[in-house]
Amino acid sequence: MLMITSFANPRVAQAFVDYMATQGVILTIQQHNQSDIWLADESQAERVRVELARFIENPGDPRYLAASWQSGQTNSGLRYRRFPFLATLRERAGPVTWIVMLACVVVYIAMSLIGDQTVMVWLAWPFDPVLKFEVWRYFTHIFMHFSLMHILFNLLWWWYLGGAVEKRLGSGKLIVITVISALLSGYVQQKFSGPWFGGLSGVVYALMGYVWLRGERDPQSGIYLQRGLIIFALLWIVASWFDWFGMSMANGAHIAGLIVGLAMAFVDTLNARKRT
């Protein structure tokens, strides 16, 4: 038997299995931390991978729902936990995703209790030449948020995008994207506004760029971002640049992060194509 892929959502896994059954290919699901899909007849592996790439590009296509009805398997027989929302939060995020989220929450609470300035003195980008060897400052600015909406918006995107990268490509890949984008987006932002800035948005934009381009160029990676969302991200950058909403935003970090993410995805998919 050959393992084809894994899905965090068992219903999505069942939809793909049902569709392949209508195509004459029998797949089985084994439940572990995720729903692992296995193929008994390995001679059909290439065909399954082609169909999987199409499925990942548009899992909501009506033909997949129709396949579930046709196969008579609209009830997958899977048992779901009583708290599906909490289960989804846990299953979609790996340890790095959770650690960064926890760090952001802890820092936000500290800023609320003892004041923004006190925390920024310890975590902000080096604001004095004598601080340039305090290496953590080049990265810890991503943990600081200045309003509830600011942190909620960033953590939601971080969980959605960072969790997908970590689950599909590994914790190491998420760490590399986070470290590089935090450093470069922070460098650009301090050139625009000085050292007094914070937020995870530079990393979030890097993840947006990475996930979108990686999904476009390498569908078998299992990660993708709908084109409408990347268009929204670009429009948000334009709106922020011209201050249409009257909010102070780290425009330099957003643009730099997006470029970093696109560049990393291009390099990764270039290497993947060379290997194939």
Curated annotation (Swiss-Prot):
**Which species is the source of this protein?**
Salmonella paratyphi A (strain AKU_12601)
**SUPFAM superfamilies of this UniProt entry?**
Rhomboid-like
The text of the family note is: Belongs to the peptidase S54 family.
Q: Does the keyword Cell membrane apply?
A: yes
The membrane topology term of the UniProt record is:
Multi-pass membrane protein
- Role description: Rhomboid-type serine protease that catalyzes intramembrane proteolysis.
Q: Which GO cellular component does the record give, naming just one?
A: plasma membrane
* Leading EC class: hydrolase
**In Gene Ontology terms, what is a biological process of this protein?**
proteolysis
The record's listing under InterPro entries reads: GlpG_N_sf (IPR038236), Peptidase_S54_GlpG_N (IPR022732), Peptidase_S54_rhomboid_dom (IPR022764), Rhomboid-like_sf (IPR035952), Rhomboid_protease_GlpG (IPR023662)
Taken from the record, one Pfam family name reads Rhomboid
Q: Which NCBIfam families match?
A: PRK10907.1, rhombo_GlpG
Tell me which UniProt keywords the record has, alphabetically.
Cell inner membrane, Cell membrane, Hydrolase, Membrane, Protease, Serine protease, Transmembrane, Transmembrane helix
- Please list every transmembrane segment annotated in the UniProt record, as residue ranges: 94-114, 142-162, 169-189, 192-212, 229-249, 250-270
Which compartments is it annotated to reside in? Cell inner membrane
- The molecule here is called Rhomboid protease GlpG
Q: Which reaction does it catalyse?
A: Cleaves type-1 transmembrane domains using a catalytic dyad composed of serine and histidine that are contributed by different transmembrane domains
The UniProt GO MF terms for this protein read: serine-type endopeptidase activity
Keyword Nucleotidyltransferase assigned to the entry: answer is: no
